[in-house]
């Protein structure tokens, strides 16, 4: 497996956006790239079988602006994952990430996701097979454990096995996955966060790139976590309040923050290109509803787009209308 130099690879992991089912599609990722030019982006999880047998353009196609971009795979069959990894490399991805953190019933029934944390030897076999099949970095996203697991040594042992098999980096969602009794949404909120386990993992294994995920919602929290880990991965915060992603990018890069209206306008050429291909406006605008979150007029922006983007023939002028009404509302509030 060919990897970038360790320091350069670790630097590229400082900021990333989590793979989120039904959210981080290609339109979302293009928007996030505009907000955070240096961030590492991740696809929604795609099962290895779907990559091999499905409509690849629909499932794993992406815009060149999205680099660096990782394909997150689901599955537990080493041979299928290896084949999917080869396809991902041919399509131009920068990283392959194996999902060992999703707790949904459907995923459990397929023997992948978080339940794999109880089968570290199998995960190691999957990682080794993908590493043998591709020159791309193969990484793992996992939880601290499942259900009532409360033994750091077991968690660290899982990490050691997958890293020993060739994993180049681990993303640690710093809470357990409860496989019974909680929905996937509740599993992102109810199990307590234990950042200290990720910190300890990095402290004890300084050569291993460790990215922290789970409950990170502000620039201040991100910068604090970066004192202990190589990177932070924003999830829901990057989606519901995407300007936080831009603010963190600015803090890490030293570049000045851009106004929300400027970032919105930067999205226009991509949106127009999709509209010209016959795609409905709603597929792009659903990812920008939170751009003015917490700002005067922010609710107006969300309302105009939510009510109008699904209508036949809706175009960029609706976004301009939403932006103008947001400005008008902000002026009235300030007056």
Curated annotation (Swiss-Prot):
Site (Interacts with tRNA): 99, 185, 188, 299, 302
Reaction(s) the record says it catalyses: 5,6-dihydrouridine(20) in tRNA + NADP(+) = uridine(20) in tRNA + NADPH + H(+); 5,6-dihydrouridine(20) in tRNA + NAD(+) = uridine(20) in tRNA + NADH + H(+); 5,6-dihydrouridine(20a) in tRNA + NADP(+) = uridine(20a) in tRNA + NADPH + H(+); 5,6-dihydrouridine(20a) in tRNA + NAD(+) = uridine(20a) in tRNA + NADH + H(+)
Protein's name according to its UniProt entry: tRNA-dihydrouridine(20/20a) synthase
Family: Belongs to the Dus family. DusA subfamily.
Enzyme Commission number(s) from the entry: 1.3.1.-, 1.3.1.91
Residues the record lists as binding FMN: 19-21, 72, 141, 173, 213-215, 235-236
S-S pairs: none
Active-site residues (renumbered): 102 (proton donor)
Keyword check for Oxidoreductase: yes
Alphabetized HAMAP family for the sequence: DusA_subfam (MF_02041)
Top EC group: oxidoreductase
Cofactor: FMN
Organism: Xanthomonas campestris pv. campestris (strain ATCC 33913 / DSM 3586 / NCPPB 528 / LMG 568 / P 25)
GO MF term set: flavin adenine dinucleotide binding; FMN binding; tRNA binding; tRNA-dihydrouridine20 synthase activity; tRNA-dihydrouridine20a synthase activity
Record keyword RNA-binding present: yes
Keywords in alphabetical order: Flavoprotein, FMN, NADP, Oxidoreductase, RNA-binding, tRNA processing, tRNA-binding
Function text: Catalyzes the synthesis of 5,6-dihydrouridine (D), a modified base found in the D-loop of most tRNAs, via the reduction of the C5-C6 double bond in target uridines. Specifically modifies U20 and U20a in tRNAs.
């Amino acid at each position: 497996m060919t990897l970038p130099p360790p320091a350069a690879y670790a630097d590229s992991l400082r900021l990333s956006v989590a793979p989120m089912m039904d959210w981080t599609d290609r339109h979302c990722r293009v928007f996030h790239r505009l907000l955070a030019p240096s961030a590492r982006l991740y696809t929604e999880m795609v099962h290895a079988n779907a990559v091999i047998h499905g409509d690849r353009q629909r499932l794993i196609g992406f815009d060149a602006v999205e680099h660096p971009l990782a394909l997150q795979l689901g599955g537990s069959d080493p041979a299928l994952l290896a084949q999917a990894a080869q396809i991902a490399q041919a399509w131009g991805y920068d990283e392959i990430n194996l999902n060992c953190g999703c707790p949904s019933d459907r995923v459990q029934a397929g023997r992948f996701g978080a339940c794999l944390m109880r089968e570290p030897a199998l995960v190691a076999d999957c990682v080794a097979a993908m590493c043998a099949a591709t020159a791309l970095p193969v990484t793992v996203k996992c939880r601290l454990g499942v259900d009532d697991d409360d033994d750091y040594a077991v968690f660290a042992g899982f990490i050691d096995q997958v890293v020993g098999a060739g994993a180049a980096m681990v993303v640690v969602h710093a809470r357990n996955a409860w496989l019974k009794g909680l929905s996937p949404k509740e599993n992102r909120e109810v199990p307590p966060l234990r950042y200290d386990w990720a910190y300890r993992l990095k402290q004890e294994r300084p050569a291993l790139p460790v990215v922290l995920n789970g409950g990170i919602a502000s620039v201040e929290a991100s910068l604090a976590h970066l004192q202990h880990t190589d990177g932070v991965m924003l999830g829901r915060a990057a989606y519901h309040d995407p300007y936080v992603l831009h603010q963190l990018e600015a803090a890490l890069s030293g570049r000045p923050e851009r106004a929300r209206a400027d970032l919105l306008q930067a999205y226009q050429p991509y949106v127009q290109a999709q509209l010209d291909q016959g795609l409905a406006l709603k597929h792009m605008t659903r990812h920008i509803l939170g751009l003015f979150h917490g700002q005067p007029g922010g609710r107006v922006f969300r309302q105009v787009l939510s009510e109008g983007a699904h209508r036949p023939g809706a175009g960029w002028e609706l976004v301009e209308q939403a932006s103008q009404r947001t400005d008008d509302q902000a002026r009235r509030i300030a007056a």
